[in-house]
Design a protein with these regions (language model features):
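Conserved beta-strand signature within the Rossmann-like core of class I S-adenosyl-L-methionine
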Residues: 156-162
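Short catalytic micro-motifs in class I SAM-dependent methyltransferases
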Residues: 130-134
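A short glycine-rich, Lys/Arg-flanked "PGG" loop and its adjoining helix->strand segment in the class I
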Residues: 142-154
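Conserved class I S-adenosyl-L-methionine
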Residues: 2-56
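A C-terminal cap/extension of S-adenosyl-L-methionine-dependent methyltransferases
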Residues: 195-239
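Short alpha-helix
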Residues: 174-189
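Class I SAM-dependent methyltransferase SAM/SAH-binding core
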Residues: 63, 69-115
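A conserved beta-strand element that flanks and buttresses the S-adenosyl-L-methionine
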Residues: 127
Length: 239
């Protein structure tokens, strides 16, 4: 069994166990008030990242790594990106089937992100959302990062939306902090960091504020930046 296959099984088991432990309403945007501002903050960070690179919705070709049901590509549709230029890959076949049903105008493939089939320099933007946190194997993480760089056009951008903190008391998460990003993406040689944008707060704090003190959510993010757990790191591929 390959490392990628082991990771796929681990991710599937995690989400199944997570759903069993937390319940179906845990991340329900409509019915769980804990979720709203966490989602809003994450989306603000993505939109801010796209603005910072002056992304062109009419022309930009985008690849989403670990796309799941396609949720990370949906905001791009709202921003006017061309559906035919939006691509997503995921190793979980059932997630790809859902994405294809929900967004029939987009391109989805069930493939391993450590061995992408796209030619070199295909995409203007390559993004990921929360996949490296669960990718604890350093070799696999390096392979995926190198594939992301390979398929990005020279001077194109990589948007890394991930959690900079792990979960205390468990080894199933590996924080995507700046040290790890520099190691995986060869910052300084293959890529350069252009921006780091704050997103959602660490879940216990963010969920509490979203439900009980929503007016304080973004104030807490600004005044207490160490409480920001999710960030978007904008990398530019060197020529």
């Amino acid at each position: 069994m390959t490392i990628a296959e082991t990771t796929r099984i681990s991710v599937e088991n995690y989400y199944r166990d997570y759903g069993a432990r937390k319940g179906s309403l845990r991340n329900d945007l409509l019915r769980n008030p804990e979720v709203l501002f966490q989602v809003l903050a994450a989306e603000v960070s993505i939109v801010s990242a796209l603005r910072s690179i002056q992304a062109d919705p009419a022309r930009a070709k985008v690849l989403d790594i670990g796309c799941g049901e396609g949720a990370s590509l949906f905001p791009l549709l709202r921003l006017g990106f061309e559906p035919s230029n939006l691509h997503g890959v995921d190793i979980r076949g059932e997630q790809i089937a859902l994405a294809q049903a929900r967004y029939p105008g987009l391109h989805f493939q069930c493939i391993d992100a450590s061995s992408l089939k796209f030619p070199d320099a295909t995409f203007d933007i390559v993004q990921e959302s929360m996949i490296f946190l669960q990718m604890t194997d350093q070799q696999l993480g390096k392979q995926v990062a190198q594939q992301m760089i390979r398929v990005t056009k020279p001077s194109g951008h990589l948007l890394l939306s991930d959690w900079r903190y792990g979960k205390p008391g468990t080894s199933e998460f590996k924080p995507m902090n700046q040290v790890r990003i520099a190691s995986l993406f060869n910052v300084g040689s293959q890529t350069s960091i252009r921006k780091v944008l704050p997103g959602a707060l660490v879940p216990p704090v963010g969920r509490f504020l979203s439900k009980n003190l929503p007016s304080m959510y973004f104030a807490a993010s600004s005044l207490l930046p160490f409480l920001v757990g999710q960030q978007v790191t904008v990398l530019q591929k060197n020529r």
